[in-house]
Structures are given as structure tokens and as C-alpha cells.
């Protein structure tokens, strides 16, 4: 398989895994957790799981795999910058946004902001060309996700927080390419390490007693494993094979997977607007992945 196919498959897997974030986060909030609790706890749990899983691998080997830069300090600095955008900014503002609006609306604003920011930051930071088909593909995919997910009501706080989260995520994907960091479990582990440190600050500021029960524990583990570990693994791997803009636009397929899961597991029939939106998203993904004419 060529790089485009492999990268697209990883990005689609990331979208499928990320489809679980909104629902689980909402359930955890209804169980008494606040946004700061969820963002920090899912990240530290994910970091713990990966640390145990990768315990026998020497640090030097992990760093050598992540980057060919000889200085460990430089590599950790680059990872710390990416973690601030891709973990702290994404998780912190995304979770707050879920507290101020419908999960579907948060997904629309966040993913649209990520796709658009990745396209333009890729132009200014990576000097990637922006072709007409890339612009049209991005707009089609954003229109598609809006048709499927937008619920009508909105909140200014939701829009602001989701936009910040999405823009940070888009810039994160560009900087991973700029720093030439090799995606995978090693990179994901260190992103989660720095992300846990950043997210500990708002968590401790808003510290309160948490009454853990089975639902809360299972919800946090679900968020830690599915979108946090596996989702970031797939996203960082996709960035190794294709541009940041292509990855972000492909991940706009997230609501398609969410709707398919609802159809399979809870027998919720797809609506006509879902079918129209899916056509727009798929057309957008095909267009942005189209090879430019020589």
C-alpha cells in the first residue's frame, strides 16, 4: 500500500475511536465529574497504562525512534510544545465546551477549526501549497459534518472553547510534521506525560472530593484507552504518511462512525440529513487527497 492509503486508514481509525469522546464525557459529567477532572484523569490513566506496557523499553530507544535529533533535551522540548497544543489545549477546552453545548455541536466546531487551521498553518509553517481542490475538499467536509451534527442551539462559550481546542489540535498536527516526530506509542506516551503535567494545574485548582463508582471508573478507562491512547496513536501514525490538513479533513468522518455505531448498537436509523452529510464528507476527503496536477 502507498503512503496515502496507509495514512488515510490510520486517520479513519482515529475518527472512529474519537467518536466515543462526546457521549462518554457527557455521561461522566452527569456522574459528578467536572471538565477539569475528566481531562486530567483520562490523560493520567492513559499515561499509566502506556508506561506499564512500555516499561521494558529503554528511554534512549524510545527517543531514538521518535526523532533523529541527537539532543534529548531538544526532542523533549518539541514534544512538550506539541503536548501543550495537542493534549492540554485540546482536552481542556474541548471538555469545557461539552459543558456548554450539545456534544454534536462541539464536534462540528472543533473538527472544522482543526481542519481549517491545519490547512493554513501547513501553508505558513511547512510551506505546503494550498490547491483549489484542497480548499473545496475542506469546505465540503466541513459542510458535511455540519449537516450531520449541528443541532441548532449554540452557546458563545461553547463556540469559543471548541474553536480554541480545534485550532490547537490543527497546529499540533502541523508541528508534529515540522519537528519530524515519528508517530506511534512512544510519542503518544510522552505527549501524555507532558499533557498530564499541564492538566494537573486546573485539576488541582478545582480539586474537590470525587465519589468513584463503577460507571465513573469504566468511563474514564474507556476515554483513556479508546480516543486517548489508540486515537492519538492513529493520528500521529497518519501524520507520518500524509499532510496535517489531509489527516484533519479525513478525521471529519468522525460523525459518520458515530452514526453507524448508533445504528448497529442501539438501532438508531440514519436520517436523510446524515446521508447528505456523509456524501459531502466523503467527497471532501476524496478531493483533498487528490494528487495535484503536475
Per-segment meaning from a language model:
Residues 28, 38, 42, 97, ...:
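Hydrophobic/aromatic residues within transmembrane alpha-helices
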Residues 37, 43-45, 94-126, 244-263:
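Specific alpha-helical transmembrane segments that line the substrate/conduction pathway
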Residues 19, 84-88, 92, 112-120, ...:
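Hydrophobic/small/kink-forming positions within alpha-helical transmembrane segments
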Residues 1-41, 151-178, 219:
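Glycine-/small-residue-enriched transmembrane alpha-helix faces in small-molecule transporters
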Residues 30-89, 117-118, 168-172, 189-206, ...:
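Transmembrane alpha-helices of multi-pass small-molecule transport proteins
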Residues 20-22, 57-105, 119, 147, ...:
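Specific transmembrane alpha-helical segments of multi-pass solute transporters/efflux pumps
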Residues 50, 121, 130-149, 199, ...:
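Hydrophobic transmembrane alpha-helices of multi-pass small-molecule transport proteins
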Residues 17-33, 38, 45, 91-101, ...:
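Juxtamembrane C-cap of transmembrane helices in multi-pass membrane transport proteins
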Amino acid at each position: 500500500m502507498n503512503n496515502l492509503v496507509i495514512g488515510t486508514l490510520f486517520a479513519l481509525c482515529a475518527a472512529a475511536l474519537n467518536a466515543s469522546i462526546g457521549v462518554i464525557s457527557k455521561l461522566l459529567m452527569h456522574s459528578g465529574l467536572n471538565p477539569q477532572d475528566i481531562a486530567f484523569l483520562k490523560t493520567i490513566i492513559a499515561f499509566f497504562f502506556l508506561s506499564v506496557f512500555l516499561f521494558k523499553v529503554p528511554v534512549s530507544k524510545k527517543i531514538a525512534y521518535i526523532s533523529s535529533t541527537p539532543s534529548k533535551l531538544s526532542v523533549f522540548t518539541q514534544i512538550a510544545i506539541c503536548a501543550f497544543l495537542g493534549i492540554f489545549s485540546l482536552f481542556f477546552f474541548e471538555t469545557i465546551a461539552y459543558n456548554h453545548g450539545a456534544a454534536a455541536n462541539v464536534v462540528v466546531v472543533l473538527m472544522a477549526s482543526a481542519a481549517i487551521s491545519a490547512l493554513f498553518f501547513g501553508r505558513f509553517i511547512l510551506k505546503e501549497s494550498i490547491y483549489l481542490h484542497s480548499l473545496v475538499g475542506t469546505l465540503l467536509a466541513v459542510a458535511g459534518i455540519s449537516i450531520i451534527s449541528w443541532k441548532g442551539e449554540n452557546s458563545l462559550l461553547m463556540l469559543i472553547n471548541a474553536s480554541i481546542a480545534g485550532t490547537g489540535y490543527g497546529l499540533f498536527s502541523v508541528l508534529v510534521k515540522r519537528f519530524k516526530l515519528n508517530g506511534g506509542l512512544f510519542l503518544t506516551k510522552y505527549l501524555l506525560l507532558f499533557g498530564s503535567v499541564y492538566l494537573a494545574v486546573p485539576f488541582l485548582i478545582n480539586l474537590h472530593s470525587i465519589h468513584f463508582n463503577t460507571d465513573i471508573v469504566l468511563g474514564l478507562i474507556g476515554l483513556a484507552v479508546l480516543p486517548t491512547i489508540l486515537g492519538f496513536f492513529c493520528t500521529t501514525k497518519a501524520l507520518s504518511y500524509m499532510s496535517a490538513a489531509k489527516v484533519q479533513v479525513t478525521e471529519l468522518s468522525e460523525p459518520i462512525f458515530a452514526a453507524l455505531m448508533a445504528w448497529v448498537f442501539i438501532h438508531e436509523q440514519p436520517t436523510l440529513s446524515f446521508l447528505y452529510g456523509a456524501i459531502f464528507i466523503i467527497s471532501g476527503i476524496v478531493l483533498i487527497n487528490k494528487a495535484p496536477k503536475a
